[in-house]
């Protein structure tokens, strides 16, 4: 039997333009949380999340392998991926209800986020701000504990057909190497299937001394994405440095 349309994942990895407000909801964060220290968004995609953090007075770096592209090439891919999102959500109206124009009602906010991101991405390329770094998990070009917080949305657990269990563990350990706290959302793929190896991953992380818990969230994107993983490194003893 073939799976139903709703049960089929989105397929190839997309560069998504998730709005900053959605990211706050996904990761169970407040704007005040974003000012505790430097923030890493990995993968950053075309979200305006890091732009919001900097507008608030915080520090943020976005990492994505797509950032090796010239802005015009990036914009071309972004337009294509937004069209993929439009087409995919149009066949799943029970999960992604349409707005007045017949498209998924959240798509205009994605398009606005994409415009904000592209303006900032072009500025980064013109001024070498260092806000957008091309890199690929599980190897990040930052020293240990560079960031107070790392957020990782819609990559880990979302594409189990692209990344095996070893990749997931390596990626989580690398995020924990560079950040004191890591939040990952969601814990299922785009067809709502829970990640099958999450128990084994969390057991391995606990063995590393990582504090693990899950946070209940309400996703503005898909109401089935109800949990976020929070990982915290053990604090260094007083007077110790790495």
Locate each region found by the language model.
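Conserved SAM-binding strand-loop segment of SAM-dependent methyltransferases
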Residues: 128-140
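A short, conserved alpha-helix within the catalytic core of class I
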Residues: 159-174
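Conserved beta-strand signature within the Rossmann-like core of class I S-adenosyl-L-methionine
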Residues: 171-188
């Amino acid at each position: 039997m073939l799976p139903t349309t709703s049960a089929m994942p989105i397929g190839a990895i997309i560069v998504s333009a998730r709005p900053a407000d959605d990211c706050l909801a996904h990761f169970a964060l407040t704007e005040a949380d974003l000012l505790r220290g430097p923030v890493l968004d990995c993968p950053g995609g075309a979200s305006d999340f890091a732009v919001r953090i900097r507008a608030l007075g915080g520090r943020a770096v976005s990492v994505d392998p797509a950032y090796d592209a010239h802005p015009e090439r990036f914009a071309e891919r972004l337009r294509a991926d937004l069209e993929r999102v439009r087409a995919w959500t149009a066949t799943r109206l029970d999960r992604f209800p349409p707005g007045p124009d017949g498209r998924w009602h959240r798509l205009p906010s994605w398009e606005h986020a994409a415009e904000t991101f592209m303006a900032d991405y072009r500025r980064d390329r013109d001024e070498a701000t260092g806000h957008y770094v091309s890199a690929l998990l599980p190897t990040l070009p930052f020293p240990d504990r560079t960031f107070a917080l790392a957020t990782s949305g819609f990559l880990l657990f979302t594409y189990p057909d692209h990344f095996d269990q070893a990749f997931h563990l390596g990626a989580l350990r690398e995020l924990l190497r560079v950040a004191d706290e890591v939040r990952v959302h969601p814990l299922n793929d785009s067809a709502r299937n829970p990640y099958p190896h999450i128990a084994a991953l969390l057991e391995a992380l606990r063995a590393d001394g990582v504090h693990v818990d899950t946070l209940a969230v309400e996703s503005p994107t898909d109401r089935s994405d109800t949990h976020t993983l929070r990982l915290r490194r053990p604090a260094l003893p007083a007077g110790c440095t790495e």
